């Protein structure tokens, strides 16, 4: 079984498009030597790490108009 599950991710995100955008930008940061925010990550890939951060509330996004 995959972690985090797609059901958990879609419940937490406003839309799947926002989820993909946030995860891809964070994965790019991780690839460029940013520090992982999850204590014991299950994934070794950057996108998986970004999704783990998102589901554990370590990765928070904010819209330019101030929405969260």
Curated annotation (Swiss-Prot):
The keyword Transcription applies. It is an enzyme of class 2 (transferase). InterPro entries: DNA-dir_RNA_pol_omega (IPR003716), Pol_omega/Rpo6/RPB6 (IPR006110), RPB6/omega-like_sf (IPR036161). GO terms for cellular component: DNA-directed RNA polymerase complex. It catalyses: RNA(n) + a ribonucleoside 5'-triphosphate = RNA(n+1) + diphosphate. Keywords: DNA-directed RNA polymerase, Nucleotidyltransferase, Transcription, Transferase. One of its GO terms (biological process) is DNA-templated transcription. It holds the Pfam family RNA_pol_Rpb6. Disulfide bonds: none annotated. Promotes RNA polymerase assembly. Latches the N- and C-terminal regions of the beta' subunit thereby facilitating its interaction with the beta and alpha subunits. HAMAP family: RNApol_bact_RpoZ (MF_00366). The RNAP catalytic core consists of 2 alpha, 1 beta, 1 beta' and 1 omega subunit. When a sigma factor is associated with the core the holoenzyme is formed, which can initiate transcription. This is DNA-directed RNA polymerase subunit omega. It comes from Brevibacillus brevis (strain 47 / JCM 6285 / NBRC 100599). The gene is rpoZ.
């Amino acid at each position: 079984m995959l972690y985090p599950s797609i059901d958990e991710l879609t419940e937490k995100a406003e839309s799947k498009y926002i989820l993909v955008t946030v995860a891809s930008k964070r994965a790019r940061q991780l690839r460029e030597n940013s520090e992982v925010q999850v204590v014991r990550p299950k994934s070794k890939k950057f996108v998986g790490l970004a999704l783990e951060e998102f589901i554990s509330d370590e990765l928070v996004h904010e819209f330019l108009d101030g929405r969260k």
